[in-house]
Regions:
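Beta-sheet repeat architectures centered on beta-propellers
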Residues: 42-56, 62-295
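Generic structural signal for coil-to-beta-strand starts
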Residues: 18, 26, 56-57, 64
Length: 295
């Protein structure tokens, strides 16, 4: 196939009217008459790292997750690039992919995330990425020790996604079913990206409230991180419907709102009940204040 001649074939799957063949660093198609090499420097790096869904073939390379219908592949994982960049080479080469409904799933092992200055932020274990093809949105799961996926059609479920696990005794499990994780409680947590509040990024803003609209949930907690400082909890809890939660300073000072350039919001629920968040909004005032230096 070209590229690294020592790289063995890891992708061998029909899509459309061609046979797609891939090694770690190259792709080719066979159309019953000739072999055409793409020679793009990308390939499929895992024996289980590809899956077909909704007329397309998806596969994982060292640089991300790609989609093709038999032609040139398209990178679709830009929004979760930090997770793939933070995965190890061994984790990517052991990746597994599967599908359930309108979503594809990809396990990538241990992931280390980094701050913009290059310092280590956090390490996530047993990461699985979900991509919803209908709304083109990504969801990140942790703690799923999946080594291979398979979709089965049963008498009551046409989209039962099973996976082989490295848990004790190597059980076969079903993904996204029930209300526990193999008998363990599932904590609910959503973290936003770092949000710049003012159009002029150097200006200071005053944050007042977090507004949470929830379809399910009864004891939802909210944490904020101002200017990349550690998260701290704000007072009150949210429940089903719309809840307005006042943002106070870390020391609980209610006299004046916190000042910041950027903010991250973390929504968490440990009530052992199902939780579903529809929308989150912030209220704040921009100012013309600025400082010589502020993170």
């Amino acid at each position: 196939l070209g590229g690294n001649m020592d790289s063995r074939i890891k992708l061998f799957e029909t899509i459309g009217n061609v046979l797609m063949i891939g090694t770690n660093d190259n792709l080719a198609i066979w159309d019953d008459y000739k072999l055409q090499s793409f020679d793009l420097g990308i390939g499929c790096v895992s024996d289980n790292g590809y899956v077909k869904a909704l007329g397309s073939l998806f596969f994982i390379g060292y640089d991300g997750i790609f989609q093709t219908s038999g032609g040139l592949p398209k990178l679709i994982s830009a929004k979760v690039e930090k997770y793939i960049d933070g995965a190890t080479k061994a984790g990517l080469e052991a990746a597994a992919m599967g599908k359930k409904g309108n979503s594809i799933f990809c396990s990538i092992g241990t992931v280390t995330l980094y701050n913009p200055d290059g310092s280590e932020d956090m390490t996530l274990s047993d990461v699985v990425l979900e991509y919803n093809l209908r709304i083109q949105a990504w969801t990140i799961f942790t703690g799923i020790k999946a080594t291979q996926f398979a979709t089965y059609v049963s008498s009551d479920d046409v989209n039962s996604l099973q996976f082989a696990s490295t848990e004790t005794k190597y059980p076969i499990m079903e993904l996204l079913t029930g209300e526990t994780d193999n008998g363990k409680e599932i904590p609910f947590r959503i973290d936003s990206s770092n949000i710049s509040l003012s159009k002029e990024f150097e200006k200071i803003s005053y944050v007042h409230e977090v507004i949470i609209e929830s379809e399910r949930g009864s004891n939802i907690q909210c944490f904020v991180s101002l200017d990349r400082e550690p998260f701290y909890e704000i007072e009150g809890t949210a429940r089903k419907g719309a809840t307005i939660m006042k943002i106070t300073n870390k020391d609980g000072d209610h006299a004046k709102p916190p000042r910041c350039r950027t903010i991250k919001v973390s929504i968490r629920d440990f009530s052992k009940q199902l939780c579903k968040i529809s929308r989150v909004a912030l209220t704040y005032n921009s100012s013309n204040e600025e400082e010589q230096h502020r993170d």
